[in-house]
Amino acid sequence: MNIRPLQDRVLVRRAEEEKKSAGGIILTGSAQEKPSQGEVVAVGNGKKLDNGTTLPMDVKVGDKVLFGKYSGSEVKVGDETLLMMREEDIMGIIA
């Protein structure tokens, strides 16, 4: 199944979760903190403005991005869980 985000929405694949703590302790599933960075998988056409024009997206497919801990909604695509969020929920692009 393919998903094409609409307007200013972005589909993000979350980065892998850390399996160990900073002190070297192996973390179980419930103790692992979900990373707040990932890779852009798909983008919409941009935000529609009141005057009818479309504001182009700043992010593109392949960008590594930072986002808030509670940003986006999880969506299941095939056997993979991705995040759908608005571009404004993205805090920055990792260079």
UniProtKB/Swiss-Prot annotation:
GO terms for biological process: chaperone cofactor-dependent protein refolding. It comes from Francisella tularensis subsp. tularensis (strain SCHU S4 / Schu 4). Keywords: Chaperone, Cytoplasm. It is found in: Cytoplasm. This is Co-chaperonin GroES. SMART domains: Cpn10 (SM00883). Its main location: cytoplasm. The keyword Cytoplasm applies. Together with the chaperonin GroEL, plays an essential role in assisting protein folding. The GroEL-GroES system forms a nano-cage that allows encapsulation of the non-native substrate proteins and provides a physical environment optimized to promote and accelerate protein folding. GroES binds to the apical surface of the GroEL ring, thereby capping the opening of the GroEL channel. GO terms for cellular component: cytoplasm. One of its GO terms (molecular function) is metal ion binding.
